Regions:
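Cleft-lining beta-strand/loop regions that shape enzyme active-site pockets
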Residues: 2-184
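Conserved functional hotspot residues or short segments at active or partner-binding sites
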Residues: 203-231
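Active-site/binding-pocket entry motifs
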Residues: 42, 64, 114, 197, ...
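A short, sequence-level motif marking secondary-structure junctions
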Residues: 36-42, 195-196, 211-212
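Metal-dependent DNA phosphodiester-chemistry modules and their immediately adjacent helices/loops
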Residues: 149, 199-204
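Short acidic, Pro/Gly- and aromatic-enriched capping/linker segments at domain boundaries
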Residues: 183-194
Length: 231
C-alpha cells in the first residue's frame, strides 16, 4: 500500500480536475465509488456580528494565511454598522501564523513594537507597527486557557499597550516559535527555533498571560450569537 503522503499527493491535483475515489471500509465487502471535483477549501476563521446598536463582536478561531484580510473586512463591516465598542474573542484559539497575527495587530496598535523573537544565539528579530490604523474605541479581548501562541501575541500586545481589556482566564503559555522540518521518509520533526516576547519584554512561555478581569466566561456565547462568517 501507499503511505499517507503518497495518497494525499494523488488526491491534490489541479483545481477543477476530477478525482475518482474508491473507498474500502473495514468489515464491508462492497466499495464506495465517488467522483470528486477538486476545488479550494475555505475554512472560516473569522466571524462577526453587531451585538446591539453599539457593540461589535469578532470571533477569531485561528491565525491562518487568510485570517488577516478577513479580520480587516470584519472591522470595516462593523464600522459601517455603527460600531462604537468592540469585543474580540480569542477563546480556544490555539494560534497559527505569526505574520498573520502581526498584520492583524497593525489594525489595532499605535506605532511601536508588536513582538520580538530571540533564538538560542540571542539574535533578535523585531516586528513593528506604523500606527496608521490605531484602534481608539473601547476594546475587550476574551481569552482562556486554550488561547495560545499567536493568540497570546495578540492579547499580550493589546495588554502591554493598554488599548484594551483582557477578560477571561489565564492563557495557555506557549511562547516559542516552532518550525516543521520534513524528512526523506515522509515524516516530519517539529523544532523549536526561538522564543517570543511581548512588547514590554515579557516571556510568557509556560506562564501564560493574566487577564485584566478574571472571569469564567460562558463558552456558549458563540452559540447564542448568530454570526456572519467571512467567506
Amino acid at each position: 500500500g501507499k503511505d499517507l503522503t503518497d495518497v494525499v499527493s494523488l488526491i491534490k491535483t489541479a483545481k477543477g480536475d476530477t478525482v475518482h475515489l474508491t473507498i474500502a471500509r473495514e468489515g464491508e465487502k462492497d466499495y464506495l465509488e465517488f467522483d470528486v471535483e477538486r476545488s479550494d477549501v475555505a475554512v472560516p476563521t473569522v466571524a462577526y456580528k453587531m451585538l446591539d446598536d453599539e457593540i461589535g463582536y469578532i470571533a477569531v478561531s485561528e491565525f491562518d494565511k487568510v485570517t488577516a484580510e478577513r479580520f480587516k473586512n470584519a472591522l470595516a463591516k462593523l464600522e459601517e454598522q455603527g460600531m462604537e465598542k468592540l469585543i474580540i474573542d480569542l477563546r480556544n484559539n490555539l494560534g497559527g501564523v505569526l505574520d498573520t497575527c502581526c498584520e492583524m495587530l497593525k489594525q489595532m496598535l499605535p506605532k511601536g513594537l508588536i513582538v520580538y523573537t530571540e533564538d538560542k544565539y540571542g539574535q533578535r528579530t523585531e516586528y513593528t507597527c506604523d500606527g496608521n490604523n490605531e484602534f481608539k474605541k473601547p476594546l475587550a479581548v476574551l481569552v482562556n486557557g486554550y488561547s495560545a501562541s499567536a493568540a497570546e501575541i495578540f492579547s499580550g500586545a493589546i495588554k502591554d499597550y493598554g488599548i484594551g481589556t483582557l477578560v477571561g482566564t489565564k492563557t495557555y503559555g506557549k511562547g516559542i516559535v516552532q518550525r516543521i522540518v520534513g524528512m526523506e521518509d515522509g515524516t516530519a520533526v517539529k523544532l523549536t527555533v526561538s522564543k517570543y516576547f511581548t512588547p514590554n519584554g515579557t516571556d510568557i512561555h509556560k506562564k501564560g498571560i493574566e487577564p485584566d478581569v478574571t472571569v469564567e466566561l460562558d463558552e456558549s456565547l458563540k452559540n447564542k450569537v448568530t454570526v456572519t462568517e467571512e467567506e
